[in-house]
Amino acid sequence: MQKRDFDVNFKILDYELRIIFVHMIRIPTFTLWAFVIFAGGFCIASAGWNMSITWYIHQHGFHEADLFFSFYTQLAEWGIIVVAGGLAWAVSRRLCLFYGITAAVQGIVIWSLKQWFNAPRPATISAEQIRSIPGVDLQYWQSFPSGHTAIGLLCFGFMTVAITQLLRKNNKIIELCFLYLALAMGYSRMYLGQHNLLDVSVGGLVALTFLHTSLWLFNNWGSKVAKAQ
């Protein structure tokens, strides 16, 4: 009788722990280092190194990197958005809903900021320093902030969330790998001459704000649901 009660109680406890884990989502390594790096980039750009670092990254390239980054940057326009949504759906429809709403609202905010500031892009600031990269159509205005960097960090952040949920455990290596992919998206925008360091840094910080807020709301709502059950 005692063994049976123990088995029943253990199953109930295991079920409750799984509910709590699904609702209490945290990716501390990803968010911490993303903040440190993008905030650091913002400080460096604000200190007067914005275009000098941008030009250095843009002008020190080679053919293979040109091909890679010109392809990789396009993933922020469709590829990673779909993949992140699919992984979020695999965890739960609620997580996918949070992802979709967050991405949409962030997109509106980024678009509004671009329209408001209408900042010049590197090709407008100094056309003679721009090098030709096959397959890259340069843009000239609405530079601030970087939309590709923002959606890249948000999508890779939600991918990290989804995979840690599917694996039922946090993994620093996974978080760092996806953070590296997010940083590479921002780097590609400077490498291709489409954005400067300030654009990329602010784009990353905006996305990090939306990611953190979305996960906080998800966890807060989830805790209430778990308690109600």
Give the location of each predicted region.
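Aromatic-anchored segments of alpha-helical transmembrane domains
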Residues: 40-44, 105-112, 180-190
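Membrane-water interface of alpha-helical transmembrane segments
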Residues: 25-29, 67-70, 93, 97, ...
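Membrane-embedded catalytic cores of phosphoryl/pyrophosphoryl-handling enzymes
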Residues: 26, 132-229
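Hydrophobic, lipid-facing residues on alpha-helical transmembrane segments of integral membrane proteins
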Residues: 100-112, 116, 205, 209, ...
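N-terminal transmembrane-helix/juxtamembrane module of multi-pass inner/ER membrane proteins
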Residues: 6-80, 114-139
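Interfacial segments of alpha-helical transmembrane regions
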Residues: 85-109
